[in-house]
């Protein structure tokens, strides 16, 4: 299957999905739907044993792009976004997110939908919803505490604090820390 905003392949029993909306890889319901469809396809693919989620450009996913035409055309675009986002969490095969640059807002939610997160020193994470006066999306009020604990999650959710790669690793938000973006090849060794 072909995807408009993704680069995909299967190699050595690994399904690769790369978000391809550089440089910031902002998402909308259409992009999240494409990712969810690929993950569902990989669940059915016998040659695939695990999935690596990454992105082209400067950032993993710097949040939502509410200016995209798809939001203007739908009667309730947020409902569709919610429905597509829920699908990300239903994947049966292990998903590893390789995160460079920003994973902000819903981009953090996309990262949290993965089973493992690999960051580099240049990575930064932020649940910036309160700063923007938005409701926390992507289930981050559930997924973030499960990953970093209640106190760190409250701190991130209520202050919109930015957490850099090394600190993300220290608090458990990232499972592995690569030296730099060019060293984010660790997922293939897992």
What are these regions (language model features)?
Residues 1-56:
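Conserved CoA-thioester-binding segment of acyl-CoA-metabolizing enzymes
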Residues 7, 33-34, 47, 54-90, ...:
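Glycine- (often His-adjacent) and acidic-residue-rich active-site loop
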Residues 17, 53, 65, 110-111, ...:
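Hydrophobic/aromatic residues within transmembrane alpha-helices
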Residues 84, 88-90, 98, 104-158, ...:
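CoA-thioester-processing core
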Residues 94:
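PIN/NYN-family metal-dependent endoribonuclease catalytic core
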Residues 161-167:
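Acidic, divalent-metal-coordinating active-site segment for phosphoryl/phosphodiester hydrolysis
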Residues 176-181:
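Short acidic-hydrophobic, aromatic-tinged amphipathic segments that line or gate anion-handling sites
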Residues 183-190:
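Single conserved hydrophobic/aromatic residue that forms the stacking wall/gate
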């Amino acid at each position: 299957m072909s995807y408009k905003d993704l680069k995909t392949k299967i190699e050595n029993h690994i399904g690769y999905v790369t978000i391809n909306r550089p440089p910031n890889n902002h998402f909308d319901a259409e992009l999240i739907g494409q990712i969810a469809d690929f993950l569902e396809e990989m669940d059915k693919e016998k040659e695939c044993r695990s999935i690596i989620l990454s992105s082209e450009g400067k950032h993993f996913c710097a949040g939502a792009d509410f200016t995209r035409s798809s939001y203007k055309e739908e009667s309730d675009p947020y409902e569709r976004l919610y429905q597509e986002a829920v699908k990300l969490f239903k994947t049966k095969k292990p998903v590893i997110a390789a995160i460079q640059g920003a994973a902000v807002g819903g981009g953090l939610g996309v990262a949290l939908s993965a089973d493992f997160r690999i960051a580099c020193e240049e990575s930064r994470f932020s649940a910036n919803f309160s700063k923007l006066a938005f409701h926390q999306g992507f289930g981050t009020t559930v997924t973030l505490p499960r990953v970093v604990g209640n106190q760190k999650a409250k701190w991130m959710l209520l202050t919109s604090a930015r957490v850099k790669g090394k600190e993300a690793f220290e608090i458990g938000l990232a499972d592995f820390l690569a030296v730099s973006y060019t060293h984010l090849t660790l997922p293939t060794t897992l």
